[in-house]
A protein has these predicted regions:
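Charged, low-complexity intrinsically disordered segments
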Residues: 1-314
């Protein structure tokens, strides 16, 4: 049995277990940089694991920097980061390359710098992530970047480590594994009652590397000849409605939720006035889409300019 629990404000590990897991004996595995076992710490923590392959032959010395420095920010945060189209400008590449070349801990004065390379106070100002997907560079929103960057890059790196080999040996010997991560939670707990597919596509909750480890150990993800393979349906979008009481939303998550409900990108949503946001959210309701001759899915796929052209024609 594999279970994942969180370290950050989620109560005791025992309280996070579901009924099927309670009473079982688990081997506890701290997947973070707090692990006192050097092999496990440096083989599982995103701060240490690396070098990792990115794109076009480029490497980042740590997975954490690969992920954090794929993100784009306004020029007010990183000088000359993006051009008028919100694509990377020279300042972005200089910033990215600087951090991709650093090793942890020797090149970082503290954990905060590797975790927040644009500054702790700027984390919620990210306007997307820049990555090469199927041969084409794209600026990715929250969930697409999770699927195109976070999951596959970590999976390909971690399976090469001695730490992961130890986890596989424990699993294959019949041990129950309790993975512990800052951004983890037990999908089987009644509070969530998720599948891993739900967790991947849930914009309301963070998805830490512990989830990738759990999916690898459960056989939902595998790495074959350097390529990541997924169980059928795992990466397909879900229309599941998530319980509003999971936890209080951050300001960043409120924006992400609004963009999701309005059927636009996070960047487009951020640029809209409050009145236009309300208009888009109302128009995206199933009954209103049908009234305009669209299915909800078809309406959501329309470019934002086309949506407003239709809506403005009704005014």
């Amino acid at each position: 049995m594999i279970r994942l629990v969180g370290k950050r404000g989620k109560g005791s590990f025992e309280s996070q277990l579901d009924e099927a897991a309670k009473g079982k004996e688990f081997v506890q595995i701290d997947c973070t940089s707090d692990n006192t076992d050097k092999v496990m710490r440096e083989g599982l923590s995103p701060f240490y694991i690396g070098p990792v392959e990115c794109y076009d032959g480029l490497q980042s010395q740590t997975f954490e920097s690969a992920w954090q420095c794929a993100k784009l920010y306004p020029n007010s945060v990183i000088d000359d980061c993006v051009d008028a189209n919100r694509h990377p400008a020279p300042g972005y590449f200089a910033w990215r390359d600087k951090f991709w070349a650093k090793r942890y801990p020797e090149d970082f004065p503290n954990k905060s710098e590797i975790r927040f390379p644009a500054g702790r106070g700027n984390a919620n100002k990210c306007i997307g992530a820049w990555w090469k997907v199927n041969g084409t560079f794209e600026r990715l929103d929250y969930i697409p970047s999770r699927k195109a960057i976070y999951i596959p890059v970590y999976a390909k790196a971690v399976v090469k480590t001695e730490a992961y080999r130890r986890l596989v040996e424990l699993r294959d010997s019949g041990k129950n594994l309790l993975l512990i991560d800052f951004d983890g939670y037990n999908i089987h707990h009644p509070k969530y009652n998720f599948t891993y597919r739900d967790a991947i596509h849930c914009w309301r909750l963070r998805m830490g590397h512990g989830f990738v480890l759990a999916m690898l150990l459960e056989g939902l993800i595998r790495v074959e000849n350097g390529e990541v393979k997924y169980a059928d349906g795992l990466m397909e979008e879900t229309n599941r409605e998530y319980s509003p009481d999971l936890r209080k939303l951050t300001e960043e998550e409120k924006l992400i939720r609004g963009a999701h409900e309005g059927g636009v990108t996070l960047e487009e949503w951020t640029a809209l006035s409050l009145d236009d946001r309300r208009l888009l959210k109302k128009a995206a309701k199933t009954e209103n889409a049908h009234a305009r001759g669209f299915t909800k899915a078809a309406w959501m796929r329309l470019p934002v300019a086309e949506k407003f052209a239709i809506l403005c024609g009704e005014r």
